Structures are given as structure tokens and as C-alpha cells.
A protein has these predicted regions:
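PRPP-associated nucleotide enzymes
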Residues: 1-146
Length: 146
């Protein structure tokens, strides 16, 4: 397991924000709850936008994998053209494949780009913007042990 610090996150988010701004110029930031919320907020600051929304995606309840990915609280994105979908990591990619498919089904006129800090080679989907590849389990600085 690897701990991913706040300082690393800020440095990586700045790199990604510059790349996203220069190559895509999104109108909207869409964070996937919960892992993508901290990053979505950082991107909203760096890209100077208040159009920062979230949706929920659940693939596990506790340690039990659900038969289907639950996706809910999807904001209305029909009036926009370019949206980044932000999460902390793509692991197996199953959840993100479902999220991206649902968004494209609902908003076919919108161009979606996936942004993560980490992804794994075994993932079913590769992010459009990413700074780190890993095979390790990542413990993010925003994951609190209560």
C-alpha cells in the first residue's frame, strides 16, 4: 500500500490542470463521488470555474461487489459541450466504463474526457488525462479512518 500525500496531489493536479486547459478547455467539471470530489474541487480552482458538479457511483456495498454499478444523482449536462469526468483512480475500470457509457447515453452531444491521477494497466478503460500508473493499492490523503 502506498500513501498519496496532499502535496503530491496538489503537484499532480496542477500538471493535469494545465494539460486539460491546453488540450480540452472543459466547460464543466464532474466529480465522481467520493474519490473524485477532492480533485474536482482542485480543478475548479485551477481552471477558475464554478461549474463543478458531482454524481454517485457504487460498485461495492462494504466488501460485496454488486451485480451492476449503481449510478445516480447525475446532473443535467445537456447545455454543455465539453465535460471532464474526474475520479482519483481507475482500478478494474468496471465502474468507470459504466459511468462513461451512462453519460454518453444521456448526453450524446457532450464530449466527455476522463481524468484521474492513477490508473492500472489492467483497467478496462484508460483515462484521457492521467499522471501516474500503478499496480499498488493507493491510500489517498482524503481517505479518513474514523
Amino acid at each position: 500500500m502506498r500513501f498519496y500525500s496532499y502535496e503530491e496531489c496538489v503537484a499532480d493536479a496542477k500538471i493535469l490542470a494545465r494539460q486539460i486547459r491546453d488540450e480540452f478547455a472543459p466547460e464543466v467539471i464532474l466529480g465522481v463521488s467520493r474519490g473524485g470530489l477532492a480533485l474536482a474541487q482542485l480543478f475548479a480552482e485551477y481552471l477558475d470555474t464554478r461549474l463543478c458538479f458531482s454524481l454517485n457511483s457504487i460498485h461495492y456495498k462494504g466488501d460485496v461487489k454488486l451485480d451492476e454499478v449503481e449510478i445516480f444523482n447525475i446532473p443535467e449536462l445537456g447545455g454543455y459541450k465539453r465535460v471532464i469526468v474526474v475520479d482519483d483512480m481507475v482500478d478494474s475500470g468496471e465502474s468507470m466504463v459504466a459511468v462513461m457509457a451512462k453519460l454518453r447515453e444521456l448526453f450524446s452531444q457532450v464530449e466527455f474526457k476522463l481524468v484521474t491521477i492513477f490508473y492500472k494497466d489492467k483497467s478496462l478503460i484508460k483515462p484521457d488525462f492521467c499522471v501516474r500508473k500503478t499496480d499498488e493499492w493507493i491510500h489517498f490523503c482524503w481517505e479518513v479512518e474514523l
